[in-house]
């Protein structure tokens, strides 16, 4: 069975409590369950992780380069600032990476409109809440 790493960046551990008007009321644990269920239906193993630390995300991206068939990543605010995450994803090409955001980053503050991840991802899904993770898994499964 192919494995997809689902990586989550800073503050996503606070989902369910943090700004539910923007991010919804679902917890990250519930999103992990959704991903595992979707993965099972797609024939994919899911390795679901979260960290508030950029270096952890870089380490996991590099690990995925050796162990995974693809990555779904919600880098959180690091989307807009992290050249390190951009470079880590670039270094594991052609491993497919799908970027996910719960909110529509293009309908929010202007500093959120640019993603450092998008140029090295196969695609981005934003604005569909937790469903975005399932959509990203479906999109990756179609490419694998």
From Swiss-Prot:
The keyword Acetylation does not apply. InterPro entries: DHquinase_II, DHquinase_II_CS, DHquinase_II_sf. It comes from the Bacteria. SUPFAM superfamilies: Type II 3-dehydroquinate dehydratase (SSF52304). Substrate binds at residues 74, 80, 87, 102-103, 112. It catalyses: 3-dehydroquinate = 3-dehydroshikimate + H2O. Pathway: Metabolic intermediate biosynthesis; chorismate biosynthesis; chorismate from D-erythrose 4-phosphate and phosphoenolpyruvate: step 3/7. One of its GO terms (biological process) is amino acid biosynthetic process. One of its GO terms (molecular function) is 3-dehydroquinate dehydratase activity. Its EC number is 4.2.1.10. Pfam families: DHquinase_II (PF01220). Keywords: Amino-acid biosynthesis, Aromatic amino acid biosynthesis, Lyase. It is an enzyme of class 4 (lyase). Belongs to the type-II 3-dehydroquinase family. Catalyzes a trans-dehydration via an enolate intermediate. Homododecamer. This is 3-dehydroquinate dehydratase. The lineage of its organism: Bacteria, Pseudomonadati, Pseudomonadota, Alphaproteobacteria, Hyphomicrobiales.
